[in-house]
UniProtKB/Swiss-Prot annotation:
One of its GO terms (cellular component) is peroxisomal matrix. This is Catalase. It is found in: Cytoplasm, Cytosol; Peroxisome matrix. GO terms for biological process: hydrogen peroxide catabolic process; response to hydrogen peroxide.
Length: 492
């Protein structure tokens, strides 16, 4: 009998029903009782096992990005970037790397409509020969706050009222009135792009600045951009209401059906590159996650293409248990000093350990597809077969040794130990620049969304005045139009 053959897998299903331990089940309908009317006997092991398993079927949903859909495919390098990075998966045009991608909404629960106004998650896990690289981004290039100290409050303000469980504008506008840097993200959040028609027709962004390092050790800051080959398409508020009322899973269905029909979604990957010596040449901090980099100065460079050509086999195993972490990088890619990115490195792994368990990286969808070895051992639900006698390092009985050193950015950091804001906040300029690129009808939809939100009866005159001041500092005309429709006199 081959004891290694029958590992847990549907590939080894028997033609008849069994318990988890493999014992035969001859009746899956009737409980074991005393007589036909009962009571039920506790010795009905299969009944107890079936109910106990059902009670534990679900895991805690993600605190953000709970509603999502996943698909598999590949990333192919199309342009040579070896002068910028020594990353193996980017080593030459034509190199392909298997990936799994997850799209999501951010704020609402697992079963919420995919048609609601929200930022969308756009996360890609590259299964490279040097380990997993997780590019965990969104469909907008900026975020509401630049410091993770405010992140829990940011999410709570966006989520439903803890008393009524209703998402309310007064809570959102109250909290973010204390974060003027959030206006740039609102220029996306209240814009058409946060009502994408589906996942296939939206952009993706790495959001944060990272670093690319070449073989010589030269580092450049980098931002990642995903551009859909089928173009960007959004819905109006009215269309979103109609679509959500018809099918609350419309984007998941569209993604699944498109792949099943052979109409594979595709995105082009572009990067922006900045020399670290140029960081101080801008009127904003390039490592501030509330800012974008000007494309006229730092143009988009093509790198490769992402193609999703396989649907997942099991939603729970490959979507609910799929775990991303910005801390997962590979040689040739490194973090920047972005404050929010630095804290996400800890927070994502921490939430996965809580949500899935300490051995979540052993799950097939999360495990690297290359040889790997460490002495992280045991723990709840560990299922890795290990037969070593040495579980420590260094050892003269174990040939395992540290890996070859690869280049990482080296720089001298100086400063006082203090809690403070960055010197170049420049909170409003880019929000105004974005607004002025729109056609009048798009500007009007943006203004209407502000008027609707600020008309919430619990939004105070003080809060309205603050937001009109912010909008006016971004674009005087925009602030005046919102103020006039609210019958509020602008302060600027």
């Amino acid at each position: 009998m081959d004891l290694s053959k029958y590992r847990p897998s549907s590939a080894y299903d028997t033609p008849f029903l069994t318990t988890n331990a493999g014992g035969p089940v001859y009746n899956n309908v009737s409980s074991l009782t005393v007589g036909p009317r009962g009571p039920v006997l506790l010795e009905d092991y299969h009944l107890i096992e079936k109910l106990a398993t059902f009670d534990r079927e679900r895991i805690p949903e993600r605190v953000v990005h709970a509603r999502g859909a996943s698909a598999k495919g590949f990333f192919e390098v199309t342009h040579d970037v070896s002068h910028l990075t020594c990353a193996d998966f980017l080593r030459a045009p034509g190199v392909q790397t298997p990936v799994i991608c997850r799209f999501s909404t951010v704020v609402h629960e697992r079963g919420s409509p995919e048609s609601i106004r929200d930022i969308r998650g756009f996360a890609v896990k590259f299964y490279t020969r040097e380990g997993n690289f997780d590019l965990v981004g969104n469909n907008v290039p900026v975020f509401f706050n630049r410091d993770a100290k405010s992140f829990p409050d940011t999410i709570r303000a966006l989520k439903p009222n803890p008393k009524s469980h209703i998402q309310e504008n007064w809570r959102i506008l109250d909290f973010f009135s204390f974060l003027p840097e959030s206006l740039h993200t609102f220029a996306f959040f209240y814009d058409d792009v946060c009502l994408p028609i589906n996942y296939r027709h939206m952009e993706g962004f790495g959001v944060h600045a990272y670093q690319l390092i070449n073989k010589a050790g030269k580092a450049h800051y980098v931002k990642f951009h995903w551009k859909p080959t089928c173009g960007v398409k959004s819905m109006t508020e009215e269309e979103a209401i109609r679509v959500g009322g018809t099918n609350h899973s419309h984007a998941t269905k569209d993604l699944y059906d498109s792949i099943a029909a052979g109409n594979y979604p595709e995105w082009k990957l572009f990067i922006q590159i900045m020399d670290p010596e140029d960081v101080d040449k801008f009127d904003f901090d390039p490592l501030d996650v509330t800012k974008t980099w000007p494309e006229d100065i730092l143009p988009l460079m093509p790198v490769g293409r992402l193609v999703l050509n396989r649907n997942i086999d099991n939603f729970f195993a490959e979507n609910e248990q799929l775990a991303f972490n910005p801390g997962h990088i590979v040689p040739g890619v490194y973090y920047s000093e972005d404050k929010l990115l630095q804290t996400r490195i800890f927070a994502y792994a921490d939430t996965q350990r809580h949500r899935i368990g300490p051995n979540y990286m052993q799950l097939p969808v999360n495990a690297p597809k290359c040889a790997h070895h460490n002495n992280h051992r045991d723990g709840a639900m560990n299922f890795m077969h290990r037969d070593e006698e040495v579980d420590y390092l260094p050892s003269r009985f174990d040939p395992c040794r540290p890996a070859e050193q690869y280049p990482i950015p080296s720089c001298v950091l100086t400063g006082r130990r203090e809690k403070c804001v960055i010197p170049k906040e420049n909170n409003f300029k880019q929000a105004g620049e974005r607004y002025r690129t729109w056609e009048p009808d798009r500007q009007d939809r943006y203004i209407n969304k502000w008027v609707e939100s600020l008309s919430d009866p619990r939004v105070t005159h003080e809060i309205r005045s603050i937001w009109i001041s912010y909008l006016s500092q971004a674009d005087k005309s925009c602030g005046q139009k919102v103020a006039s429709r609210l019958l509020v006199k602008p302060t600027m």
